[in-house]
């Protein structure tokens, strides 16, 4: 199933899907009684940044899975909408505290009523049952990391593969390091200079250095620079939301990387420890809205080196990266 976050909706379809979809999300949030503020924050963010409607959540009914399926299908029989809403329900369930058997049962019944694949539900089950190794492997396999590695190999072939293995082994690569350190001398206001300043500001080792990030991951860091995102846990969630908006992957899989790393405490990345409850749901879905305007997959379809010499604002304009609307935030020194 292909899910396109930038797909345009008519006003009538938007209103219909908002009624059915938000009621479905509220059904999950009410499973334990009064919805938690964290679950409500996530639902409001979906309402405001993805559905873009004005709707009082308290006025929406709770629905049985068959009622959800009927309401959504009456809006549009395209299964993409049922796929999207099942994913949204799963994310809300994860924002609502410890995974529960009641939420899992609702999600399983909903996937059956929707007649769609239950991949999001399987992810929820793995988290609930503590299958951390399976969860990590699944997320790495389906997240943006896969495309970043493939794009790096396509751009650099075997030398880049060897350099990536060196980084993962903690071995210094002088050739790679020298190339990346040359960005410090690029013109002011250039994309390349902005990337080097991003590394310096965060005290990150340059690719190629001992302790530096593997080369594929630098594509993610370039999204921080292009989109204007910082490096707190909330900002990391926001930039991954930004990526979910433009990548040709299932947005759920992209967002789940952030959920696992910064909300559920599952350390998917080998470079940073997992954290609990550090995501900002509003910021993450605002990032997804931001990324949906971008006209190119910035992970898979460009080599940042082709653009490092250009002014940062020129590169942003080329890829239709509009101003984010808030300043990036960084961890306290």
What are these regions (language model features)?
Residues 47, 51, 115, 129-133, ...:
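Charge-rich, low-complexity amphipathic helices
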Residues 50, 54, 75, 92, ...:
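Short, flexible helical or helix-coil boundary motifs
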Residues 296-333:
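Acidic, carboxylate-rich catalytic segments that either coordinate divalent cations
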